[in-house]
Amino acid sequence: MLGQLLGEHLPAGAVIAASGALGMGKTVFAQGLAQGLGIAGPVVSPTFTYIQEYMGRLPFCHVDAYRLEGWEEEELAQIGLSDCFLSAKTAYVEWPEFIRPFLPAETIDLHLNAVPQQPEWRQLLFYFDTDAHNWLTPLLTPYEKV
């Protein structure tokens, strides 16, 4: 639900970097973003293809960087990683810690964590700069838990 809402408002050039343990819902969040961007059809984690691009309201690159640890900049360029961060596209990166130096400075960081007493719940922590503040804060405020 939150992923879909953000996808409906995601501006061109936005990059979201999602980190969290296995099973925390990174791919489920990507599916919500894709729905919000008007992308029909299945969205799956591109674990072995590294990058999957979809067409919706805006082009959407879904990156799974889990297997990209230690790759050099030239190798990442060969698979089209830098193309995902063009201003006309949107991008969602799972396991961003493996390619952090290659992400744009204004990347929105999302951390997904388990909630100990509620195993089916997730805590979502967003970190973003002032560029994202104007469009993102009004969307997240109703979900803020004090």
Which residues fall in each region the model found?
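Conserved post-Walker A coupling segment in P-loop NTPases
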Residues: 14, 40-44
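Conserved lysine of the Walker
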Residues: 26
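Conserved nucleotide-sensing/catalytic segment adjacent to the nucleotide-binding pocket
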Residues: 42-43, 53-95
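Short phosphate-coordinating micro-motif centered on Lys-Gly-acidic
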Residues: 71, 81-146
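The conserved Walker
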Residues: 22
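Pre-Walker A adenine-sensing motif
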Residues: 1-9
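Hydrophobic anchor at the beta1->P-loop junction of P-loop NTPases
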Residues: 16-18
